[in-house]
Amino acid sequence: MRENKSNPELKIRSTERDYKYISRITGRYAGLSLVFLTAGIVLWTVMDIIFDACIDSWKADPELNNSSYMWNILIYAIPYTLYALAAGFLVTFFSVPNVRINIRKYRDIPAEMSYAPGEHIKGGQE
């Protein structure tokens, strides 16, 4: 088992597999970011066109006057939510490879433990 850990070919294959996985995942995040950004822009444009077309009839009827305020809020609330999702996926797109690199870099550093392995912790089951 010890020979496998020090085998350079296995390390190269493992690193190559990790690199392909990271590339695939970051590609998905970039795609989702683009999808949400496009959806936000298209939705805002369509809602703005509908608002401009219907505002005259809403102002004429006093009962529909409140719906113009609600529609005006929705014009901005929904697309900004999509923009926030796009920004989140974009940040994830840039941060995932860096996090993976740091995990890979510091994987061999042992964590500091307050007790020796195999030793019972005080207050635990004996």
Curated annotation (Swiss-Prot):
- Main location group: membrane
Report one GO cellular component. Answer: plasma membrane
Entry's localization field: Cell inner membrane
Parts of the chain that traverse the membrane: 31-54, 71-98
What membrane topology does this protein have? Multi-pass membrane protein
Q: Does the keyword Signal apply?
A: no
List the protein's name.
Answer: Protein TrbF
Question: Which UniProt keywords are present, listed alphabetically?
Answer: Cell inner membrane, Cell membrane, Conjugation, Membrane, Plasmid, Transmembrane, Transmembrane helix
Q: Which InterPro entries match?
A: Plasmid_mob_TrbF (IPR016386)
